[in-house]
UniProtKB/Swiss-Prot annotation:
It comes from the Eukaryota. The N-terminal domain is essential for RNAP assembly and basal transcription, whereas the C-terminal domain is involved in interaction with transcriptional regulators and with upstream promoter elements. GO terms for molecular function: DNA binding; DNA-directed RNA polymerase activity; protein dimerization activity. This is DNA-directed RNA polymerase subunit alpha. It comes from Pinus thunbergii (Japanese black pine). One of its GO terms (cellular component) is mitochondrion. It is an enzyme of class 2 (transferase).
Length: 335
């Protein structure tokens, strides 16, 4: 069915939601298709979208809890069935939706005996709980429970050092990722020079955002990454012009050469693309056809490996070696 729709308008590139389900309040699923794409583009977009969905989409969760007269995470509270640790873990699992940025304050004030759920949290107007039935604690006696919460909207995650507790304040390891998982697959159709691709993207969220909203935010974040390149010439950014002899790299080479950490060095080499090395077109195109796109990719090849690349002769190898030695003082191994 999708293939028939695509053949009607081969020139119109568009996203289409082909499946949407809510398995529960905290598990939503969406499947989307982007088409038609030229051969090779679906994989490029799929990789970028998956990374943006899993790492760049913002979420809201509890980052700090304050309990009066409690000194330790594993303390037992008279009249409450759960330990402090269990209460913190239950609070960590609560899924929020927020329209505002920054830190917000919330609280729980309950008199037992009774069960305490997410519905008992007193929230600011801009914050909403996705599943109000989520369990927090069970008060077994006629006691008063007063809990102060700090809620934050952010992206990625925050890991606190252990035993970092003072005056009953307990930081919580926060995972701000509303996207639980994201996968993509590619379907090709056509033949010869008319091969086209359909990118299928599957998204699972915790209900803090719908899959469609997560897709929109991830797409917007990717677009924002490239906006500086569009205005780079107007802003006259140092090192971004293409004049002969100029430094095309966005950072000094000394940062790469003096970095003694292997991991940091690899990250730096991943940021340098082979088109920045000003290699001859024939040499550059041969490297691209061999899926060598960054300096890190290139350094994974020995001299003998380079000689085995199609249409890559001794002259091309010497050109690469000269550039590596001149710019980075690097001499690849012979085998």
């Amino acid at each position: 069915m999708i293939r028939d729709e695509i053949s009607v308008s081969i020139q119109t590139l568009r996203w289409k939601c082909i499946e949407s389900r809510a398995y529960s309040k905290r598990l939503h699923y969406g499947r989307f298709a982007l088409s038609p794409l030229h051969k090779g583009r679906a994989d490029t977009i799929g990789i970028a979208m998956r990374r943006a969905l899993l790492g760049e989409v913002e979420g809201t969760c509890i980052t700090r809890v304050k309990l009066e007269n409690i000194k330790h995470e594993y303390s037992a509270i008279i009249g409450i069935e759960e330990s402090v640790h269990d209460i913190l873990m239950n609070l960590k699992e609560i899924v929020f939706r927020s329209d505002s940025y920054g830190i917000r304050e919330a609280s729980i004030y309950i008199v037992g005996p009774r069960n305490v759920t997410a519905q008992d949290i007193i929230l600011p107007p801009s914050v909403k709980i996705i599943d109000t039935t989520q369990h927090i604690a069970r008060l077994t006696k006629s006691i008063t429970s007063d809990i102060r919460l700090q809620i934050e909207k952010n992206r990625g995650y925050i890991i606190h050092s252990p035993n970092n507790y003072q005056d009953g304040i307990f930081p919580i390891d926060a995972v701000f990722m509303p996207v639980r998982d994201a996968n993509y697959s590619i379907h090709s159709y056509g033949s010869g020079n008319e091969i086209r691709e359909v990118l299928f993207l599957e998204i699972w969220t915790n209900g803090g955002l719908t899959p469609r909203e997560a897709l929109y935010e991830a797409s917007r974040n990717l677009i924002d990454l490239f906006i500086p390149f569009l205005h780079g010439e107007e802003q006259n950014i140092d090192g971004m012009n293409n004049k002969k002899g100029s430094n095309m790299l966005p950072f000094p080479l000394s940062h790469v050469l003096t970095d003694t950490g292997e991991t940091k060095e690899k990250i730096a080499f991943q940021l340098i693309f082979i088109d920045q090395l000003e290699l001859p077109p024939k040499t550059y195109n041969s490297l691209r056809r061999a899926n060598i796109h960054t300096l890190l990719d290139l350094l994974n090849y020995s001299r003998e490996d380079l000689m085995r690349i199609e249409h890559f002769g001794k002259e091309s190898v010497e050109q690469v070696l000269e550039v590596l030695q001149k710019l980075f003082a690097i001499d690849p191994p012979r085998n």
